């Protein structure tokens, strides 16, 4: 066993470790933060080393086949438990082999952790018999753009260009991410530069640009682009539907109606997507009866209402406290021969929650089970949010414990439960939920970290809060100004300015690091 431990840490890591400890010991108040991290590094290296021998034995048999989800989950655990200093060696020693499906799964799980995601992306690229798929590149482009690493994003695009992997969707993603960051000019530039990448813009790209602008609440700019470029492309029903949805979100119902009429005049027949958007717009404008009239006027032989349309109607009736109409609409859908999906059931659950009819909520869950419809994280979140808002926290936790047996909670689910226990001053239980979430391989969001750090600050558990903040930064997640400011005030009050300086330096690295070696 000792032989494996010696091999688990290479010479460069040992040099870094000892020089690192020598520097840190000059500041006694900082030691408790860094010492904790250093011990974790050594322990994890030993553990991963022992596992690697067993993993190698398992993989020596051609009969051993691992499920993609299981491998992705195991890689996720390595990523979440390993500091950046030893991340590559931890992945190497895990013995886990990657495939395109596995990499895509992991990238999806860590889509909100740009730094960590990119480290894994780099590591996987070096593995034998593996090449990144177009989808993996697209997911990485999204992750880097999300943390405003645009230079790296274009480096990825150029790498795809060399491999002849670029397509229109690549630039649609770039336009969408720029627009979401309110970089409208850059989004339009991405559209115009396609020609230089041997991809002449087509109607799909044009629609992609309009969609990016509309979804980022820049519908007026989208309308302007449409007017200026409509002669270059022949608008189709999707083009008009995009603008229709954009004006609906503005919200500007008269302009949405105008676009709808223009669509008809241009000879573009509304499809089910157009009708769905129009129903959604009217419902959000408080005109659910008019929306229902549109549904009634649809010719079932040409355009049959979808479960999405019914879910919107049920949801709207619920928010307007028209529970009877919500139930009637649900039953009408079933009578039409259409089977309710999880989205429709969730709308019905929301309607019953709004009316505080919890017995009916639990009956709906039973009906879902009898009809083979599995609740999802949103089902759980709707119920939890309602119970927590009403102060029924014990019942909320009971629902949480039951729901995790039938569905996969997301980060929002865990965040609500952790926040609930922090507010109840039950930090031990909050910590248990946090550890359970990590064990299940669910990647914490910025909000998940924030609620726990804020809870620890409230209890004046400064050391744990600092370690958690450091872990958050290590994962490439930037803390909110409120969370960092709260911990900062606490450290100043406790006269731990050196620890604050250390955390500030870590933050600066996260903000300024270009992510590429």
UniProtKB/Swiss-Prot annotation:
Keyword terms: Mitochondrion, Repeat, Transit peptide
PROSITE patterns found in the cross-reference section: PPR (PS51375)
Cell location: Mitochondrion
Primary subcellular site in the record, as a coarse category: mitochondrion
Start-end of each PPR repeat: 133-163, 167-201, 202-232, 236-270, 271-305, 306-340, 341-375, 376-406, 410-444, 445-479
Domain of life of the organism encoding this protein: Eukaryota
Family designation: Belongs to the PPR family. P subfamily.
Name of the protein described by the UniProt record: Pentatricopeptide repeat-containing protein At1g77360, mitochondrial
Naturally occurring in which organism (per UniProt): Arabidopsis thaliana (Mouse-ear cress)
């Amino acid at each position: 066993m000792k032989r494996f431990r010696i091999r688990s840490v290479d010479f460069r890591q040992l040099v870094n470790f000892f020089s690192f400890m020598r520097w840190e010991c000059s500041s006694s108040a900082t030691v408790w933060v860094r010492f904790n991290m250093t011990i974790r590094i050594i322990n994890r290296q030993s553990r991963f080393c022992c596992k690697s021998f067993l993993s190698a034995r398992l993989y020596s048999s051609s009969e051993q086949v691992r499920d993609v989800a299981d491998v992705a989950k195991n890689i996720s655990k390595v990523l979440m438990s390993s500091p950046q200093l030893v991340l590559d060696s931890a992945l190497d020693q895990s013995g886990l082999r990657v495939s395109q499906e596995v990499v895509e799964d992991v990238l999806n799980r860590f889509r909100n952790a740009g730094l960590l995601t990119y480290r894994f992306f780099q590591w996987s690229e070096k593995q034998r018999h593996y090449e990144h798929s177009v989808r993996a590149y697209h997911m990485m482009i999204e992750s880097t753009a999300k943390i405003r690493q645009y230079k790296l994003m274009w480096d990825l695009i150029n790498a795809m260009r060399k491999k002849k992997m670029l397509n229109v969707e690549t630039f649609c993603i770039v336009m969408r991410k720029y627009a979401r960051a309110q970089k409208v000019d850059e989004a339009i530039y991405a559209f115009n530069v396609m020609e230089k990448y041997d991809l002449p813009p087509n109607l799909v790209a044009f629609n992609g640009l309009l969609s990016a602008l509309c979804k980022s609440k820049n519908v007026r700019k989208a309308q302007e682009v449409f007017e200026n470029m409509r002669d270059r492309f022949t608008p189709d029903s999707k083009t008009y539907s995009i603008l229709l949805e954009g004006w609906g979100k503005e919200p500007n119902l008269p302009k949405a109606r105008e676009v709808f009429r223009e669509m008809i005049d241009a000879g573009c027949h509304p499809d089910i997507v157009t009708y769905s958007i129009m129903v959604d717009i009217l419902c959000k404008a408080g005109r659910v009866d008019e929306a229902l009239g549109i549904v009634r006027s649809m010719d079932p032989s040409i355009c049959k209402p979808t479960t999405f349309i019914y879910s919107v109607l049920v949801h709207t009736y619920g928010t307007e406290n028209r529970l009877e109409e919500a139930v009637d609409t649900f039953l009408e859908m079933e009578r039409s021969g259409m089977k309710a999906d999880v989205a429709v059931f969730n709308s019905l659950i929301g309607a019953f929650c709004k009316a505080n009819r919890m017995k009916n909520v639990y009956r709906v869950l039973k009906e879902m089970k009898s009809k083979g419809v599995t609740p999802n994280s949103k089902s759980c979140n709707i119920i939890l949010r309602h119970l927590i808002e009403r102060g029924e926290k014990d019942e909320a936790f009971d629902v949480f414990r039951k729901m995790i047996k039938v569905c996969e909670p997301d980060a929002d689910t865990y965040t609500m439960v952790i926040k609930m226990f922090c507010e109840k001053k039950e930090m031990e239980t909050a910590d248990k939920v946090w550890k359970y979430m990590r064990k299940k391989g669910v990647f914490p969001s910025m909000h998940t970290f924030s609620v726990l750090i804020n809870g620890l600050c409230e209890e004046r558990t400064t050391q744990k809060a600092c370690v958690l903040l450091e872990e958050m930064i290590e994962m490439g997640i930037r803390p909110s100004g409120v969370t960092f400011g709260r911990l900062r005030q606490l450290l100043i009050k406790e006269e731990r300015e050196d620890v604050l300086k250390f955390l500030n330096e870590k933050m600066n690295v996260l903000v300024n690091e270009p992510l590429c070696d």
